[in-house]
UniProtKB/Swiss-Prot annotation:
Pfam families: ATP_bind_3, TilS. It comes from the Bacteria. It catalyses: cytidine(34) in tRNA(Ile2) + L-lysine + ATP = lysidine(34) in tRNA(Ile2) + AMP + diphosphate + H(+). SUPFAM superfamilies: Adenine nucleotide alpha hydrolases-like (SSF52402), MesJ substrate recognition domain-like (SSF82829). It comes from Beutenbergia cavernae (strain ATCC BAA-8 / DSM 12333 / CCUG 43141 / JCM 11478 / NBRC 16432 / NCIMB 13614 / HKI 0122). GO terms for molecular function: ATP binding; tRNA(Ile)-lysidine synthase activity. This is tRNA(Ile)-lysidine synthase. InterPro entries: Rossmann-like_a/b/a_fold, TilS/TtcA_N, tRNA_Ile_lys_synt, tRNA_Ile_lys_synt_N, tRNA_Ile_lys_synt_subst-bd. It is an enzyme of class 6 (ligase). ATP binds at residues 33-38. Its EC number is 6.3.4.19. One of its GO terms (cellular component) is cytoplasm. It is found in: Cytoplasm. Ligates lysine onto the cytidine present at position 34 of the AUA codon-specific tRNA(Ile) that contains the anticodon CAU, in an ATP-dependent manner. Cytidine is converted to lysidine, thus changing the amino acid specificity of the tRNA from methionine to isoleucine.
Amino acid sequence: MSGPHPSVAAARNAVRALLAELEPARGVLVACSGGADSLALAAATAFVAPRAGRAAGAVVVDHALQAGSAEVAARAADQCRGLGLEARVVRVDVDIALGGPEGAARAARYAALEAASREAGDAVVLLGHTLDDQAETVLLRLARGSGARSLAGMPRRRGVFARPFLHLERARLREVVDAVGLTPWEDPTNAVDGPARRADGGPLPRSAIRGRVLPALTEALGPGVPASLARSADLLREDADALDAFAADLLSTARGEDGSLDVEILAAAPPAVRRRALRRAALDAGSPAGDLAHVHVEALDALVTGYHGQAGVDLPGGRRAVRACGRLTL
C-alpha cells in the first residue's frame, strides 16, 4: 500500500513538528481563508492533531470587502468541517481608511483570530504562510528601507500565532489540496490586475511583488530566488535576536533608579546596539510601536551623540525625551 503524496507528507510533517513544540494540552485553531495554503494547513492539521492528542478547530474570517465574501467564508468552513475540524465564521468590520485596504484587513483579521484564541482557551492559531510569502515579505520590506528586524520576515512563532509552512513552497501546498480533493478559493486581490488597488490606481504592493517582481527575479537569476530570500530572513533573524539581547543589556546598564539613561554609557555603545536600546526605551515609555519611526530614533540618537543644547524630542503617544545633566529622560 502506497503512502500519501510527498507534498501531503511534507505538510503533515511540518504541522507535526510545530505541534511538538507546544505545551502538551494546548489546542490549535487553523486560520482558513479558503485559499490553497490554508486549506492544505487545515487538511494536515485535521490529520495530525487528533493523533497527537490535541484539540483542533478552524476559524474563517469574513472581511466583507468583496461581493460574495459570505459565501466564500461559508464554503471554506464547510470544507474544514468535511476534514473533521469544528469550524466557525467570524465577520469583521474593516475600516480601509486605517492603513489602506491591506493593512486594515490584516489588523481586523488578527484581532479576530486573537479573540478566537482566547475563547478557545489560549489555543495556538496556525497560519498558512509559505516560503513564497516569506520571500515576498522580505522584498516588500527591503523596498521600504527596513532594518534587520523587519527584513527577518515573519517569525515561525509569535504570541498565539504559529506558521508551520514557512519552509514549504506554495506550489507544494497546491499539490496537497489537489491530492486530498479540496477546492481552493482564488482570491482576486492577489492578482496584479485584481479589483483592489492603491489610491493611485496601481496594484497592491504585495500583489505587484507576487505577480511581477518575484517572477522577474526568478527569470533573471533562476528558480532558487524565493528560497534564498527566505534563508536570508532566517539569518537576519538570528542577527536581530543577538542585537536585541545586546540592546537589552545596554539599557539595563544605562538605566538609573529613576528610569533615566546615562548618556555616556549609551554613547560608548556601537550605533546598531544603541539605536535599538533607544527604540526599546521609547516603547517602554509608552510610544506606540506602529507610530515610532526611524526619524524618531535618529532624533533620540542625536540627543546622545550630537548634543549641542537642542530641545527635547517629541515622540508618538504624547511622550517627550529630554537631556539634562548627562541623563536622558523619556
